[in-house]
From Swiss-Prot:
Superkingdom assignment: Eukaryota
Subcellular location: Cytoplasm, Cytosol; Preautophagosomal structure membrane; Endosome membrane
SUPFAM superfamilies, A to Z: BAR/IMD domain-like (SSF103657), PX domain (SSF64268)
UniProt cross-references to Gene3D superfamilies, sorted A to Z: Arfaptin homology (AH) domain/BAR domain (1.20.1270.60), Phox-like domain (3.30.1520.10)
Compositionally skewed regions (Polar residues) per UniProt: 1-18
GO biological process, one term: early endosome to Golgi transport
Family: Belongs to the sorting nexin family.
Stated name of the protein: Sorting nexin-4
Taxonomy of the source species: Eukaryota, Fungi, Dikarya, Ascomycota, Saccharomycotina
Positions bound to a 1,2-diacyl-sn-glycero-3-phospho-(1D-myo-inositol-3-phosphate): R83, K109, R128
Organism: Candida glabrata (strain ATCC 2001 / BCRC 20586 / JCM 3761 / NBRC 0622 / NRRL Y-65 / CBS 138)
UniProt-annotated stretches for the region Disordered: 1-22
InterPro entries cross-referenced by the UniProt entry: AH/BAR_dom_sf, PX_dom, PX_dom_sf
Entry comment, domain topic: The PX domain binds phosphatidylinositol 3-phosphate which is necessary for peripheral membrane localization to the perivacuolar punctate structures.
Keywords for this protein: Autophagy, Coiled coil, Cytoplasm, Endosome, Lipid-binding, Membrane, Protein transport, Transport
Amino acid sequence: MDSASADASVTGSGNAKGSSAERVNGGGKFYKLEILVSDPQKRAGEAGLGPYVSYQISTRTDNPSYHGNQKASFDDIIVVHRRYNDVVLLHDILQNDHPTCIIPPLPDKKVLQYIAGDRFGRRFTQRRCHSLQNFLRRVSQHPILSTSKVLEIFLVGNEWDTYRKNIAGTLQNAQKEDVTDAVMNAFKKVHNQNEEFTEIRDRSDKLDNSVNRINKVFHRVVKKNEAIIEDYSKLGLTLQELQELVSSDNDKLADSLKVFIEGVTQFSYGLQDLNMFIDYEYLIDLKDLSHYIGSMKQTMRLKDQKQIDYEELSDYLTKSIKEKNNLISGYGGGNFLTSKLEELAGYNQEASRRDKINKLESTISSLTTELETAKKVADTFEQETLKEVKKFEEIKNDELKISLNNLADENIKFYERMLETWEKVDQSLR
């Protein structure tokens, strides 16, 4: 376990704005947990492996378990370095261990960047760094996920490599079973859907559509700002050439041009900083929120799968009971032609009927037990999903507030800087 000073943990990264300190339940007590992802670095791979990007993950917590059960201060910082695949494994383990929880999504693998060779570029790594920050912040805010032992192992670091090697194979088998279940029920629908879930789906669809529209608008804003920045850069170069031409003939005009060029340059730099914030952070927040909504829908689909399992068992049980009753009353067990053929072949129809009734009674008994279990599972998933949706709403509202505040702060900072710059230019030109 690496340690760092308290001051070092909060410097040098814009991602610090996305970090959070939440109280998490551990053994009946509540502990603070703050996670910061920063400093993406290209590193050389081991023998035979290519280079990769690692991310510094700094954790502050007063949970003694994170500090070897010694008395810990919240200012004591644990620092580890993890690559993207490590975070993917953490995500998959949480998903496997907590099937009823809404597991925050991860950034996409970005295959195109791998093919183009841009996965070590600043824009790609910084955007991914911010997205990983969003993921770990959501985990730290979740009352169940934040107390997971695997999260502690991931953040502390001493046992992570061993744990990763031991768990990978087992996890893949469990995920294959989940995929099979999902495919089997992909085109089935719940017959008796709770109206509350219908309302939740409608709200989430509307929110997702709104987020995607805002995302498209700000993508256009980024493109437009890039064009403006380029135009002002060209304007600055042209004015510099003009300044050189008049510097020998008119010192006053040359000085005025110099001041104006500085204003143009400051505007270009300021807009570039604002644009980088929108591109590297705000757009990532919007995209991650859309993916988070998708994770919530996935949890609701899993809840639906359990409900579908219960409804299908119920239908099967009803059919079995009906068939048994028909046999008892003498109307079941096959059609008229089949009965005549059995009679001609010398079958004892009464013995066959009793045998079918006995088998159906055994089936009904087994189905009744399975139906009770399926009902409990479906009800549990429904209750837990409602709790998860409530927590999702809390985290989502908190994120929107933080993200919009950051966007407002960056815009205010830009315009205050421009006001100060051009007031100086105006005074100098008078």
